[in-house]
C-alpha cells in the first residue's frame, strides 16, 4: 500500500488527491496523510512562477517531514493576470511530475481585492457570503454553478502530474538518463 503525503490540510485539495489516486491506482491501494507545511510563498501567490514554486516547496518540505512516504503531493493555487489556477507537483522516488490546472477568469471586483493584498478565498467568501468557500467548491464551483469545483479541476491536473511516475515511456527515458 502506497503512503501518500498531501502537503496541505485543505479538504478540497485532499479530496482531489484521493480521487486522482483512486483513478490511477485503484481504491484501497494507498493511504493519505495530510500535513501542514509552509510553501514559503505569499498566502496568495501571484504569477505562474511563484505559484509553481509554492507547490515545489510544499513537496520539498513534506519530504523532509515524512521521508519514508512513497508519494509527496503539493497543490498551490495562484492568480496570474485575471485567471486563477493551480500547480500540482508530485514526487515519487526520484521522479517528479508537474501539471497546471485549468484556469478560471475572475471578475474585476474580486481581482481588485487580490491586488490590495487579500486572498481569493477571502474575497469570494465576502462576495458570496459562503464561509470558508475555498475549502468547498471555491470560485470554480461558485462561478460554474457546481458544474466544476476546485476538487474536480485539481483532480484532472493531479492525474496528469502522475503520468511521469506511471507511464512506461517516462520510466524508460529516466533509466536511459541514469545510465
UniProtKB/Swiss-Prot annotation:
It is an enzyme of class 3 (hydrolase). Substrate binds at residues 8-13, 68-69. One of its GO terms (molecular function) is metal ion binding. GO terms for biological process: nucleotide metabolic process; thiamine metabolic process. Gene3D superfamilies: 3.90.950.10. Disulfide bonds: none annotated. It catalyses: XTP + H2O = XDP + phosphate + H(+); ITP + H2O = IDP + phosphate + H(+). It holds the Pfam family NTPase_I-T. SUPFAM superfamilies: ITPase-like. Keywords: Hydrolase, Magnesium, Manganese, Metal-binding, Nucleotide metabolism, Nucleotide-binding. InterPro entries: ITPase-like_fam, Non_canon_purine_NTPase, NTPase/PRRC1, YjjX_NTPase. Its EC number is 3.6.1.73. The keyword Manganese applies. Its cofactor is Mg(2+); Mn(2+). Mg(2+) binds at residues 38, 68. Binds 1 divalent metal cation per subunit; can use either Mg(2+) or Mn(2+). Phosphatase that hydrolyzes non-canonical purine nucleotides such as XTP and ITP to their respective diphosphate derivatives. Probably excludes non-canonical purines from DNA/RNA precursor pool, thus preventing their incorporation into DNA/RNA and avoiding chromosomal lesions. Homodimer. Belongs to the YjjX NTPase family. PANTHER family: NON-CANONICAL PURINE NTP PHOSPHATASE_PRRC1 DOMAIN-CONTAINING PROTEIN (PTHR34699:SF2), PTHR34699. This is Inosine/xanthosine triphosphatase. The lineage of its organism: Bacteria, Pseudomonadati, Pseudomonadota, Gammaproteobacteria, Enterobacterales.
Amino acid at each position: 500500500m502506497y503512503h501518500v503525503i498531501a502537503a496541505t490540510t485543505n479538504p478540497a485539495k485532499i479530496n482531489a488527491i484521493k480521487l486522482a489516486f483512486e483513478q490511477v491506482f485503484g481504491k484501497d491501494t494507498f493511504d493519505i496523510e495530510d500535513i501542514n507545511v509552509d510553501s514559503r510563498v505569499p498566502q496568495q501567490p501571484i504569477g505562474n512562477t511563484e505559484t509553481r514554486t509554492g507547490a515545489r516547496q510544499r513537496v520539498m518540505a513534506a519530504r523532509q517531514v515524512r521521508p519514508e512516504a512513497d508519494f509527496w503531493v503539493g497543490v498551490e493555487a495562484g492568480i496570474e493576470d485575471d485567471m486563477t489556477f493551480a500547480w500540482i507537483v508530485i514526487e515519487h522516488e526520484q521522479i517528479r511530475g508537474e501539471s497546471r490546472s485549468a484556469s478560471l477568469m475572475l471578475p474585476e471586483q474580486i481581482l481588485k481585492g487580490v491586488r490590495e493584498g487579500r486572498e481569493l478565498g477571502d474575497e469570494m467568501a465576502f462576495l458570496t457570503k459562503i464561509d470558508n468557500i475555498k475549502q468547498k467548491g471555491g470560485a470554480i464551483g461558485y462561478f460554474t454553478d457546481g458544474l466544476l469545483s476546485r476538487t474536480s479541476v485539481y483532480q484532472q491536473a493531479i492525474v496528469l502530474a502522475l503520468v511521469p511516475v506511471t507511464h512506461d515511456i517516462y520510466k524508460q527515458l529516466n533509466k536511459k538518463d541514469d545510465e
